C-alpha cells in the first residue's frame, strides 16, 4: 500500500486578490451587457404627448406611472384568471378581461375602459386581416 500524501491544513487568511486584468474590446472577450428592464415608459410618454403635447414628465413621475400600470395589469390579469377558473376554462379571453375590468374599475371609469378596449380589439382585428 502506497503512503498517503500529507494534506496541509487550510489557511484561515483569505487569498490575496490580484488586480483584474484590463480587458479591451479587441481581446475577444464579450463584455457583459446590462439586463434589460421592461417598462411602459415609451407608451406612457406617447400617450402623454397625444393628450398634452407641451407637457413633460419627470423620471420619478414616470416610475410612479409605470408602477401604476403594472399594478392595474396584475389586478385585471388576476381577476380574469379567477373568472376563467370559475367557468372551468383554461384560457383567458376578451370576455374575461372585460368582466374583470368591470369588477375592478369603478362606475364611469369602467365604462370608458371597456369602450376603449373594445375599440382597440376591433382595430387590431381589422389590421390582422
Swiss-Prot record:
PROSITE patterns: HISTONE_H2B
Main location: nucleus
UniProt entry keywords in alphabetical sequence: Acetylation, Chromosome, DNA-binding, Isopeptide bond, Nucleosome core, Nucleus, Phosphoprotein, Ubl conjugation
InterPro entries: Histone-fold (IPR009072), Histone_H2A/H2B/H3 (IPR007125), Histone_H2B (IPR000558), HISTONE_H2B_site (IPR055333)
PTM annotation: Monoubiquitinated by the UBC2-BRE1 complex to form H2BK123ub1. H2BK123ub1 gives a specific tag for epigenetic transcriptional activation and is also prerequisite for H3K4me and H3K79me formation. H2BK123ub1 also modulates the formation of double-strand breaks during meiosis and is a prerequisite for DNA-damage checkpoint activation.
Disulfide topology: none
Positions of modified residues (N6-acetyllysine): 7-8, 12, 17
Region of interest called Disordered, as start-end residue ranges on this chain: 1-38
MF GO annotations: DNA binding; protein heterodimerization activity; structural constituent of chromatin
Comp. bias (Basic and acidic residues): 1-19
Transmembrane segment boundaries: none
Entry-annotated residues carrying Phosphoserine: 11
Subcellular location: Nucleus; Chromosome
Positions bearing the Glycyl lysine isopeptide (Lys-Gly) (interchain with G-Cter in ubiquitin) cross-link: 123
Chain positions of cross-link Glycyl lysine isopeptide (Lys-Gly) (interchain with G-Cter in SUMO): 7-8, 17-18
Record's function text: Core component of nucleosome. Nucleosomes wrap and compact DNA into chromatin, limiting DNA accessibility to the cellular machineries which require DNA as a template. Histones thereby play a central role in transcription regulation, DNA repair, DNA replication and chromosomal stability. DNA accessibility is regulated via a complex set of post-translational modifications of histones, also called histone code, and nucleosome remodeling.
Record note on quaternary structure: The nucleosome is a histone octamer containing two molecules each of H2A, H2B, H3 and H4 assembled in one H3-H4 heterotetramer and two H2A-H2B heterodimers. The octamer wraps approximately 147 bp of DNA.
Protein name: Histone H2B.2
Originating species: Debaryomyces hansenii (strain ATCC 36239 / CBS 767 / BCRC 21394 / JCM 1990 / NBRC 0083 / IGC 2968) (Yeast)
Amino acid at each position: 500500500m502506497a503512503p498517503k500524501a500529507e494534506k496541509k491544513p487550510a489557511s484561515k487568511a483569505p487569498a490575496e486578490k490580484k488586480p483584474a486584468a484590463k480587458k479591451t474590446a479587441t481581446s475577444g472577450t464579450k463584455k457583459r451587457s446590462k439586463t434589460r428592464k421592461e417598462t411602459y415608459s415609451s407608451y406612457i410618454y406617447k400617450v402623454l404627448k397625444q393628450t398634452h403635447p407641451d407637457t413633460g414628465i419627470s423620471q420619478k413621475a414616470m416610475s410612479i406611472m409605470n408602477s401604476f400600470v403594472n399594478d392595474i395589469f396584475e389586478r385585471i390579469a388576476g381577476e380574469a384568471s379567477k373568472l376563467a377558473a370559475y367557468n372551468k376554462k383554461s384560457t383567458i379571453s376578451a370576455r374575461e378581461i372585460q368582466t374583470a375590468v368591470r369588477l375592478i374599475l369603478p362606475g364611469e371609469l369602467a365604462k370608458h375602459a371597456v369602450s376603449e378596449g373594445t375599440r382597440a380589439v376591433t382595430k387590431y382585428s381589422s389590421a390582422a386581416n
